[in-house]
Structure formats: C-alpha cells, structure tokens
Regions:
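Serine-hydrolase catalytic machinery in alpha/beta-hydrolase-like enzymes
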Residues: 10-107
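Active-site signature of alpha/beta-hydrolase-fold catalytic machinery across serine-
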Residues: 47, 126-130
C-alpha cells in the first residue's frame, strides 16, 4: 500500500474548487498544488506528483469548467485562444481557494509548488501574472501564454520551470514566448525540452524533481 491514502481520498467540495488532500505518513513542510490538463480530473496528476516529491502533501484540485467527461480550468474559443473573462474570473477564484486551502490544512504557500499540466499550467501562469506574490514556485508542463493583456506584475523572487515537448507541434512553439513573458516580469525561469509530444511522463518528473532539489542542494553544499 502506498503511503498516501490514494486517488480516492475524500473529495472536499466546500471551497471554490473541489479538491483532494493526499498527505504521506512522513510528510515534511513541502506541498504541491496539482492542476490537471483538459478533459480529465484531479486524480490524473497524482502519479507524476508522487514521482516528483514522495514526501510532499498533495492538493489535487479539479477545474470547474466541464469538458466532455472531465474538466478544464477556463473556457476556450479554439485550441490556442481562450475566453479572457473566464481566465480572469477562474484565476481570481483560484487565488482565494489556494489561500483558504493552505490555511485550513496548515500549508505554507511560500514553500508550495504549483504543478500544472497543459490547461492547468496555463491557469498557474495566469495566477502568477494576475496575483503577484501568491505563487513562489511553479512547474509548468506543456504551457503557453493565454492572457491577451498581462498586467505589469513584478515576479521577482518567483522560480518557474517550463518543460516543453520537442514533438508537441501545437503547443511546443508557444513555450519560448511564455519564457520571454515571465522573464520580462522578473521571474527566474528555467526552460527545458523533453523528447516527447504533449503527453507527460517520467522525463518530466525527473526534471521537476531535480529542479526542486536544486536550491536546497546548493544551500547544503555552501553550508
């Protein structure tokens, strides 16, 4: 049996977004907010999160917009254009949700990592740009810029990892503009490419795990 209670952990539905809390027996102070891709639900991000941070508390969140048999985070117009009012509204609700969930479960947002995939990663990038200071660490898998008009947000002190797929023909070309955008706003961006398409897997987990350990390893070596 895994040390987590599993994907079927209780579904909390009393905050703005439904979510499951998965806390390992040997949980430390690390936590990951998980934002899934389009047309699925919160359980799909748990396996990769377990690979990335086995001792982290996981907050697996479900998007509120229906898409086929699953969910997404905001309305889309085409595969690469999105309803701006929906982005801003859902991002605002998520900012409040993250603060409330962290307070309820004793999580430190300053130490939390927001791990998003595809549509979920795009919600996280919007969250950073529209709510300065809320997100301090973000790992964005297969992300793209979605805001037509980003405010002049100061992201100094925010660490961001962007992982694109070399064979992701639709969304891969949008990764460099996102890197440029977040750098422009002062974020510390690490951009990587994996030899895959839009799907995510072991290579992504390895990169995120290494990225998260980086500053801690440097600090230990310096000490």
């Amino acid at each position: 049996m895994h040390r987590y209670s599993g994907e079927n952990a209780f579904l909390h539905q009393d905050l703005a977004f439904p979510y499951r809390l998965l806390k390992p027996e040997n949980a430390g102070g690390e936590s990951l907010f998980l934002l899934h891709g389009s047309g699925v639900d919160e359980t799909t991000m748990v396996p990769i999160a377990r690979q990335i941070a086995p001792n982290a508390t996981l907050v697996a969140v479900r998007g509120r917009i229906r898409q086929e048999d699953g969910f997404r985070w905001f309305e889309r117009i085409t595969p690469t254009s999105f309803e701006q009012a929906s982005i801003r509204a859902e991002t605002s609700y998520f900012a409040a949700f993250a603060s409330e969930a962290a307070k309820r479960h004793g999580l430190d947002l300053a130490r939390a990592t927001f791990l998003g995939y595809s549509n979920g990663a795009n919600l996280v990038s919007s969250l950073m740009l529209l709510n300065s200071g809320l997100v301090r660490k973000a790992a964005l898998l297969r992300a793209m810029p979605v805001l037509d008009d980003a405010p002049a947000t100061n992201l100094t002190g925010t660490r961001v990892l962007i992982v694109a797929g070399a064979a992701d023909e639709t969304y891969g070309p949008f990764a460099p503009p996102l890197v440029t955008l977040l750098n422009k706003h002062g974020a510390e961006v690490d951009a990587r490419i994996v030899p895959s398409g839009h799907e995510i897997g072991g290579p992504d987990a390895a990169i995120v795990r290494q990225w998260l350990a980086g500053p801690a390893l440097v600090a230990r070596q310096a000490g």
